């Protein structure tokens, strides 16, 4: 299965509906957010291991959550448990140059992995994402 086939299946199943969200899903390739050992499975509609007992969420689940969130350009969003950064990058694409996503991940090595993945799209350099390691249970006081 290809990236476009995965996205089209999620659209066909009714989980992706909003044009700006669909556009972001099409631009942000899940394959860039999975460990090397799982690149071949990146387009399977299933969670995949990303290390440390964690997974990258099932694409259908991410689509469902983002559709419910209804993010808009210019929004400020906190992504708690950002993991490999896939959802963070999708949200950064949606909020655009006037928005910001604060991503927080408890596990240090995953935070490093997620930050590196998000950086592939220059979202950190562009100021759309701030990716930090820490406990997100209290949010990011003063930021999100």
What are these regions (language model features)?
Residues 70-144:
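Conserved nucleotide-cofactor-binding alpha/beta core module
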Residues 1-37:
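N-terminal auxiliary segments of SAM/dcSAM-dependent transferases
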Residues 19-20, 60, 109:
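Cytosolic histidine kinase catalytic core of two-component systems
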Residues 7-8, 42-45, 56-75:
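Conserved alpha-helix/loop element of class I SAM-dependent methyltransferases that forms part
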Residues 49-55:
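Class I SAM-dependent methyltransferase Rossmann-like catalytic core
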